[in-house]
């Protein structure tokens, strides 16, 4: 059975055609076995050309902190090197998993223009009015309102705060009993 190396599998051909839309030569490598080290993966990638940048990602927090995320990014010097890495590595077994190699896509940043002015709901109760409510206030306006209320509360302390019962379990004027039992009564029962 003769194998033609010039023929690309249909899957790899579609991946390579996506590369013409990409700026740079950055690849995403996914489905990486957790036992593969950063060093071994880098050495494997260097066989396909000069690696300009290599980002092997780890969990930063949570129960998996310090463990690999299972994917990485690599930048090659030329597009031909990146295409060769896709052709050779995509679908290949690496320990117990098949590698997935694709062109990396730029992260689209959404809501950047709204970052400073977040809208937070003040109440969970539905409003029956059609006029704009306080829920469209900016975060800074809400902070100022809370600070003003705290200042007002500090200036006019209320003896009975909301939520505080007049029948409080802990009253300052009540004395606690130090010894609820007498030693003599315990000895006589033995």
UniProtKB/Swiss-Prot annotation:
GO terms for molecular function: RNA binding. Keywords: RNA-binding. Pfam families: RRM_1. Residues 25-106 form the RRM domain. InterPro entries: Nucleotide-bd_a/b_plait_sf (IPR012677), RBD_domain_sf (IPR035979), RBM18_RRM (IPR039157), RRM_dom (IPR000504). Transmembrane segments: none annotated. This is Probable RNA-binding protein 18. It comes from Xenopus laevis (African clawed frog). The lineage of its organism: Eukaryota, Metazoa, Chordata, Craniata, Vertebrata.
